[in-house]
């Protein structure tokens, strides 16, 4: 689901500003890598067992830690309902 979320966001932004879409996609990648390297760096999520990363003021990445694996569950616009 997270990949579909991310793709939808990037495609939408790219319609008006391809450079901004690329920059945001790189930021999504960097935040996901930070979560992989330091899984507890970001705040506890609203759903038990999840954590949340604010990516710019408008986007949130929700992930969970299972053992040594960090799984990004969703990438949402801040205005979207979660959970």
Predicted regions and their residues:
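Short arginine-rich
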Residues: 11-15, 35-40
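Hydrophobic side chains within alpha-helical segments
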Residues: 8-9, 34, 60, 74
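Arg/Lys-rich, positively charged N-terminal/basic patches that mediate binding to nucleic acids
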Residues: 1-23
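Amphipathic alpha-helical recognition patches that constitute DNA-binding helices
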Residues: 20-23, 27, 49, 71
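Short amphipathic alpha-helical/adjacent loop interface patches that line ligand
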Residues: 6, 25-28, 32, 39
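Enriched for short, Lys/Arg-rich terminal
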Residues: 59-60, 64-83
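Basic/aromatic recognition patch in beta-strand/loop cores that engages polyanionic ligands
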Residues: 29, 37-68
């Amino acid at each position: 689901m997270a990949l579909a979320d991310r793709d939808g966001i990037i495609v939408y932004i790219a319609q008006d500003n391809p450079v901004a879409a690329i920059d945001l996609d790189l930021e999504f990648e960097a935040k996901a890598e930070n979560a992989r390297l330091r899984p507890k760096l970001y705040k506890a999520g609203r759903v038990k067992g999840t954590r949340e990363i604010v990516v710019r003021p408008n986007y949130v990445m929700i992930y969970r830690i299972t053992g040594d694996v960090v799984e990004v569950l969703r990438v949402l616009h801040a205005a979207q309902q979660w959970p």
